[in-house]
Amino acid sequence: MAQSDITIDALSKVGQQDAEYLVSLVRSVPGFPKEGIIFRDFMPVLADPKGLKILLKALEEALPVSPSEFDSIAGLESRGFLFGPVMAAHLGKGFIAVRKAGKLPPETIGESYDLEYGTASVEIETDAVQAGKRVLIVDDLIATGGTAKAATDLIEKAGGTVVGFSFVMRLDGLDGLDKLDGKPSSSLIAMPA
């Protein structure tokens, strides 16, 4: 699939040349992980020093809310772990790891969500979110929105408030943004599902 199907969204905040450079690094892999799926691989962005610098700059410049409006960044396993802690450190915020079930030591709290063929769960440690903490959720991709919604429910169950979402990529046509309850969100690039 050609890169021409990728729309520069909030990525434009870093300038056209840098935006086009970053998009050129995103690899489309048809048939992975199964037939009918086009996997959008942004690992080449992380391997490229210039691409990584552009990505982190763009994520910070395209925040859906001001840094003064959140206390912590929650990164969703696994690719949200790649840039969430770096963003948190650079912005002077804490980082919350939202993990797949069974990956954290007790005590944890969890939230289940539906998949196409079953269910999955995400967890955080019980002391990761204090009452009233304001959280920005970051991840590489929003598709159906199930994981982002489960992470929101989990953080709110723990007493926190999700104030927004920051995604590298958004797959259009899957209505994932509809599950974010109208909270502010940003995505750097948009692609067809």
From Swiss-Prot:
GO terms for cellular component: cytoplasm. InterPro entries: Ade_phspho_trans, PRibTrfase_dom, PRTase-like, UPRTase/APRTase. Its main location: cytoplasm. The keyword Glycosyltransferase applies. Disulfide bonds: none annotated. One of its GO terms (biological process) is AMP salvage. Pathway: Purine metabolism; AMP biosynthesis via salvage pathway; AMP from adenine: step 1/1. Keywords: Cytoplasm, Glycosyltransferase, Purine salvage, Transferase. Its EC number is 2.4.2.7. It is found in: Cytoplasm. It comes from the Bacteria. Pfam families: Pribosyltran. GO terms for molecular function: adenine binding; adenine phosphoribosyltransferase activity; AMP binding. It catalyses: AMP + diphosphate = 5-phospho-alpha-D-ribose 1-diphosphate + adenine. PROSITE patterns: PUR_PYR_PR_TRANSFER (PS00103). Catalyzes a salvage reaction resulting in the formation of AMP, that is energically less costly than de novo synthesis. Belongs to the purine/pyrimidine phosphoribosyltransferase family. Homodimer. This is Adenine phosphoribosyltransferase.
